[in-house]
Swiss-Prot record:
It comes from the Bacteria. Belongs to the ivy family. Its main location: periplasm. GO terms for cellular component: periplasmic space. It is found in: Periplasm. It comes from Yersinia pestis. It holds the Pfam family Ivy. This is Uncharacterized protein YPO2857/y1376/YP_2723. Coiled coil: none annotated. InterPro entries: Inhibitor_vert_lysozyme_sf (IPR036501), Inhibitor_vertebrate_lysozyme (IPR014453).
Amino acid sequence: MSISSGSFAQPAAVVSSPGVTVPEPVASTPTMAELLQQPVYKARWQKMVKGQKNLPAWARKGAGTSGPYENITWGAQQYKVGSLCKPHDCSNNFMWVAFSNDKKHVWGLRVTVADKPEALDNPSKFATYQWLGRPNENIQAMLTAQLEKDPNWR
């Protein structure tokens, strides 16, 4: 087994000394921003944001700072869920995004926190929310739960 890197084949594992094998690197999960640039996901995203009002450019394009998405199960359904934020302003402008496992639906919860010193200690009291993609109560609960898992969200 080999892994192709450019035009050179790489060994799947590296032997560093007799009897010791170093495992091959595990491919990392793409970030939410990378997922949103894949054709199927990008098309769904563009359809979702098309009629949304008051949506900033970074959110409309799905281009922001993000970490790897997670595959989660919620209510017996599977979703790809992750966050995306405005570059250089993640604490005040971010969103949680969920794609259905069949890639046919996407929903979002955009959060804007007022730029006030008091918001640092208790951002939820200074937040406004915008639902994207018309999520039902179950999807709203899932996205809200993702937001509330953040230890900095008080």
